[in-house]
């Protein structure tokens, strides 16, 4: 059964389109909430509901495919410190890559955002069922992932990273996307 019902947050939108046709309506509602200019810079609205569901479901796992993220990729490259035999670590300069997105996320008005989520919830639930969870409740998964993120420890220093090996004779022109 449902552990974290959405019904009490706001009633679902009575005029929701089918999930397959929902992108324009979802983008319109997100633009009203966040502003059209910020929406274009920070979020991917094509398949937004499915992207959110897939990303949330994968966040508690070892890999969350970036092609399904509901956010736009950062413009700058991922940078590491260390070469040769030295351990490779996440460079401190990487934090600056996310400062604009962090400011955007912190400025999202929480109560209207939660109400919009509840209004659109039937779409999120349908996308979760289509992902392979027909008898599970997406909001329960969302709450579990949020709890997991909140419990994640703050790293004491730079994180060690490892380049994912790709066995090919073709030189990789963008190795920074493989960390």
Language model regions located:
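N-terminal Sec/ER secretory leader and immediately downstream segment
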Residues: 2-97
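Proline-rich intrinsically disordered, low-complexity coils
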Residues: 5, 11-12, 17, 24, ...
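Long, hydrophobic, amphipathic alpha-helical segments used as structural scaffolds
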Residues: 60-63, 67, 109-112, 128-135, ...
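Mid-length scaffold segments of soluble, non-membrane domains
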Residues: 79-143
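An amphipathic alpha-helical core segment
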Residues: 135-179
């Amino acid at each position: 059964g449902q552990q974290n019902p959405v019904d009490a947050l706001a009633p679902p939108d009575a005029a929701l389109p089918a999930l397959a046709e929902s992108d324009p309506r979802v983008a319109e509602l997100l633009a009203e909430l966040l502003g059209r200019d910020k929406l274009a810079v920070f979020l991917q609205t094509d398949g937004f509901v499915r992207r959110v569901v897939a990303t949330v479901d994968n966040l508690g796992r070892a890999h969350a495919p970036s092609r399904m993220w509901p956010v736009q990729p950062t413009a700058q490259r991922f940078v590491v410190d260390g070469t040769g035999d030295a351990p490779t670590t996440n460079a401190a300069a990487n934090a600056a890559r996310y400062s604009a997105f962090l400011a955007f996320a912190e400025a999202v008005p929480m109560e209207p955002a939660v109400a919009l989520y509840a209004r659109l919830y039937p779409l999120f639930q349908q996308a979760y069922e289509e992902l392979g969870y027909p008898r599970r409740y997406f909001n329960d998964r969302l709450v579990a992932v949020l709890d997991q993120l909140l419990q994640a420890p703050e790293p004491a220093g730079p994180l060690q990273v490892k380049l994912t090996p790709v066995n090919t004779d073709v030189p990789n022109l963008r190795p920074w996307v493989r960390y």
